[in-house]
C-alpha cells in the first residue's frame, strides 16, 4: 500500500476521488449516448427515413438527418400534443403556423375529421416537401398546406435555413450560434389575409412556432385575434426573439392587448401564467377573456 497517499491533504484526496467519479460518470454517459445513437441509426435499415406510428391512426415519416425527428420519436412536446387532442373536436379548424413536418397537424387532422380543416404554413421548401409526403402518407384530404411564411406584412423575406439537422430551427431571424448555415428568399403573407375566405368562427386553435418571428405573425393577425376568440399556443424562447430584435415579453403584451390571458399547461391542466423575467423555452396558451 502506498503510505504516502495517507499523508496528502484531505482536499487533495477528495479532489482526486471527485475527478475519478466525474470521469467514470462521463464514461457511462458516453456509453449510453453511443448505445442510443446505435439504436436510432438502426431504425432506418439503410434508408434516409422510416415510417413511425404517432398513434394507432396517424403515421409520420421520421428522417435520419433531422434532430426534430429524433425528438418526435422520444415523445417531443407530449404536454402540447395532449392539449391539442383534448381541445379539438370534430368539425373544428386548426391553424398551424410553422408546421415543419407536421407533428401537430397530422394529429389534428384525424381529430377534426372530414368536416374540419387544418391550415398549414411552412416556408422552407425542403421541409414543406416532407410535410407534403406526410399528408399523403395518411391520405388526409382536410389538410391544406402553403409553402409560405407569415409576418406582419406581405412580401418577401430572407429565411435562414440549416443544412445539418437543425431544420426545426429555421427562422426569419439570423442565428447567433451558427446552426443556420445558408439563406433563401421566401414569400410571406399575413394571417389576416390568409384567413379572408375562411369561416373564422370555426377556428378553434392556432399554433405558432416560428423561431422568434412570433411577434410579427401575431401583428399580422391582429384583426382576427381581436374579433374572434381562438385559443392560441405560442412558443416563448428568449434567445430566438433576441435574434429577431425584440424581447419575448412583447409577445405576452401583444396578446394581452388583444384581450387574452396567458396560461401554461401542466399535467393536462391550465395554470395562470404571470409574466416571468426570463423564458428559456416554453409553450404558452392564450385564451380570450370571457
Regions found by a protein language model. Give the residues of each.
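Conserved acidic-Pro-Pro-aromatic motif
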Residues: 49, 193-290
Amino acid at each position: 500500500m502506498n503510505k504516502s497517499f495517507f499523508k496528502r491533504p484531505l482536499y487533495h484526496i477528495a479532489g482526486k476521488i471527485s475527478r475519478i467519479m466525474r470521469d467514470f460518470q462521463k464514461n457511462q454517459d458516453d456509453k449510453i449516448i453511443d448505445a442510443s445513437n446505435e439504436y436510432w441509426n438502426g431504425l432506418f435499415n439503410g434508408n434516409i427515413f422510416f415510417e413511425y406510428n404517432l398513434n394507432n391512426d396517424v403515421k409520420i415519416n421520421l428522417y435520419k438527418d433531422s434532430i426534430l425527428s429524433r425528438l418526435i420519436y422520444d415523445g417531443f412536446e407530449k404536454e402540447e400534443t395532449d392539449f391539442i387532442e383534448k381541445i379539438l373536436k370534430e368539425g373544428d379548424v386548426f391553424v398551424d403556423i410553422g408546421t415543419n413536418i407536421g407533428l401537430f397537424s397530422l394529429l389534428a387532422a384525424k381529430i377534426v375529421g372530414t368536416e374540419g380543416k387544418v391550415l398549414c404554413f411552412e416556408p422552407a421548401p425542403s421541409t414543406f416537401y416532407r410535410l407534403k409526403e406526410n399528408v399523403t402518407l395518411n391520405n388526409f384530404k382536410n389538410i391544406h398546406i402553403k409553402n409560405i411564411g407569415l409576418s406582419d406584412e406581405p412580401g418577401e423575406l430572407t429565411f435562414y435555413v440549416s443544412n445539418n439537422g437543425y431544420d426545426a430551427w429555421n427562422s426569419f431571424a439570423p442565428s447567433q450560434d451558427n446552426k443556420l448555415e445558408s439563406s433563401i428568399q421566401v414569400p410571406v403573407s399575413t394571417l389576416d389575409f390568409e384567413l379572408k375566405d375562411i369561416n373564422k368562427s370555426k377556428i378553434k386553435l392556432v399554433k405558432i412556432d416560428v423561431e422568434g418571428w412570433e411577434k410579427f405573425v401575431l401583428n399580422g393577425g391582429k384583426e382576427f385575434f381581436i374579433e374572434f376568440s381562438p385559443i392560441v399556443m405560442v412558443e416563448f424562447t428568449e434567445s430566438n426573439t433576441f435574434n429577431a430584435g425584440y424581447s419575448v415579453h412583447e409577445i405576452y403584451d401583444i396578446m394581452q392587448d388583444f384581450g387574452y390571458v396567458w396560461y401554461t399547461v401542466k399535467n393536462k391542466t391550465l395554470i395562470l401564467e404571470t409574466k416571468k423575467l426570463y423564458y428559456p423555452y416554453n409553450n404558452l396558451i392564450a385564451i380570450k377573456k370571457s
